[in-house]
Regions:
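Extracellular beta-strand/loop-rich repeat segments of large surface/secreted proteins
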Residues: 1-106, 110
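Outer membrane beta-barrel translocator domains of Type V secretion systems
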Residues: 153-317, 424, 429
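Outer-membrane beta-barrel architecture
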Residues: 59, 191-198, 227-231, 266-272, ...
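Transmembrane beta-barrel domains of outer membrane proteins
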Residues: 16, 182, 186-187, 213, ...
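Outer membrane beta-barrel transmembrane domains
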Residues: 256-261, 343-445
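Solvent-exposed, glycine/polar-rich loop segments of beta-barrel outer-membrane systems
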Residues: 159, 213, 240, 244-246, ...
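Short glycine-rich beta-strand segments
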Residues: 200-205, 235-237, 274-280, 320-332, ...
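Outer-membrane translocation/initiation segment of Type V secreted surface proteins
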Residues: 56, 61-67, 71-73, 89-226, ...
């Protein structure tokens, strides 16, 4: 370590110098594999002033970023007299402010000869939201050359991409729980008695940045109230997430109220109102590791209408239409690295047109189904602010169109018991349901 004026210094065979503060050297030799570390004093930028430089295949490690009190944006190597031919590497370290350093063309080397060259060795990550790819440029100044940050390209790091994807996870998990009347209650019989029911459904959702394997448990009770069947249900969902560079969990607890009106013309109107809370966590691995936990409230209101037509020989057809409005309230959290993450409210409006074709038997039925769904809304925005001042914002549009298809059935186990279920998958959306399965049991009394 050196801090004061020194006459001659020679570093060869991988030698290492920790430079703290400013230093002046008459003759400095930096051989192959040797390192001059100018970042040992992290509280300020350092200047290394050299009369004569002889350097080939050496490395200069420098701080760069936000401006200091003296107007500097980086450490600096200043050559007062001569420099020998050679190519060397500059490795930049930053705790933030790289865009300001590039915008102000921070000078890293001043006074080099024309055949003394420098290049940046690696991209720069300042423990924030971006990784910066830099190139150096030189400009002639009174017969000598100054080397400065010439261009900068920034790329969001994995932690940003993963935390953005977490909002899409919350959205897809919430809308997947909407379901249909047939999935919730099976083949509901007109004039049936009061009943309790339970079902379990799960599946695997996949997008560009994540997969979500989930299972949901739902328990409900309903009773006849005039022409309407009214009921309530509670559900709990647990999802295990894999991101491109991380993992996480997603949980939902929700209460729903519903009313179902069965017409004498084989039509059914079903209205469901649901309110719940979404919980999640994100763990990002590797170089850009970070962790965050979040929670928010969500609401949905769904209206479904269907009507059954007799096709003869116990075959039936059932066109369906469904509209579901959903809202995920805005939320924010601070990650372990001090990144402030904030999501705006997300509104959803999904329309579904479907058809069920089935065949009834003495103790139940089997059917195939297909639906076309479209998200008419699904807009959201996210902002992030890192502890080092780097910021990120993006608007996300989850508007999409997709198909769902499946098979299912109902079976009567006794006078008061019914078992029902289905399997399905989706096609064509940005997020697909690779598979989904639903099984339920209803007891009437």
């Amino acid at each position: 370590t050196a801090t004061d004026s020194t006459t001659d210094l020679k570093f060869t065979n991988g030698a290492y110098w920790d430079l703290k503060g400013n230093s002046s050297v008459s003759d400095l030799t930096v051989g192959k594999g040797s390192v001059i570390n100018m970042t040992a004093d992290s509280s300020r930028y350092s200047n290394l002033q050299v009369d004569n430089l002889t350097a080939t295949d050496g490395t200069f490690v420098m701080n760069a970023g936000s401006v200091d009190g003296g107007g500097s944006y980086s450490d600096k190597l200043v050559i007062d007299k001569t420099s020998a031919a050679g190519t060397n590497t500059i490795k930049l370290i930053s705790t933030g402010g790289m865009e300001a350093a590039a915008r102000n063309q921070a000078v890293l080397v001043k006074g080099a000869a024309a055949d003394t060259k420098f290049a940046v060795s690696d991209s720069v990550y300042a423990n924030g939201l971006y990784e910066f790819d830099l190139t150096l440029a030189d400009k002639e100044n009174n017969g000598k050359y100054d080397w400065f940050i010439g261009s900068l390209q920034k790329n969001t790091v994995d932690s940003v991409n993963t935390m953005v994807s977490a909002n899409q996870v919350a959205y897809t998990a919430w809308i997947d729980g909407n379901g249909t009347l047939r999935q919730r209650l099976g083949e509901l019989q007109s004039g049936a008695d009061n009943g309790v029911w339970a079902r379990m459904f799960g599946g695997k959702l996949g997008g560009d940045e994540f997969t979500n394997k989930y299972k949901t448990y739902q328990l409900g009770y309903d009773a006849q109230a005039g022409d309407w069947r009214v009921g309530a249900a509670y559900e709990y969902s647990d999802g295990s997430l894999n991101y491109t560079s991380g993992s996480g969990e997603n949980k939902i607890g929700a209460v729903s109220l519903y009313g179902t009106l069965q017409g004498k013309d084989n039509s059914i109107l079903d209205i469901v109102v649901k309110r719940g809370r979404i919980y999640g966590d994100v763990d990002v691995y590797g170089k850009y590791s970070d962790q965050g936990d979040y929670s928010t409230d969500a609401t949905s209101i769904g209206v479904e209408y269907s009507k059954r037509f007799d096709g003869g020989n116990n075959v039936y057809f059932e066109p369906q239409a469904q509209l579901t409005f959903g809202r995920i309230d805005g939320y924010d959290y601070i990650s372990n690295k001090g990144v402030k993450v904030a999501y705006d409210d997300l509104n959803s409006f999904i329309g579904r047109l479907g058809i069920v074709a089935g065949k009834a038997f003495s103790r139940g039925d089997v059917y195939v189904k297909a639906s076309l769904l479209h998200e008419f809304s699904g807009n959201s925005s996210v902002t992030m602010l890192a502890a080092n001042g780097e910021s990120y914002s993006a608007d996300k549009d989850y508007g999409d169109t997709w198909l769902e298809a499946g098979i299912g059935g109902n079976i009567t186990l006794g006078k008061n018991c019914e078992l029902y279920g289905d399997v399905e998958r989706s096609f064509g959306g940005d997020v697909t349901k690779n598979w989904g399965a639903n099984v339920g049991f209803r007891y009437s009394f």
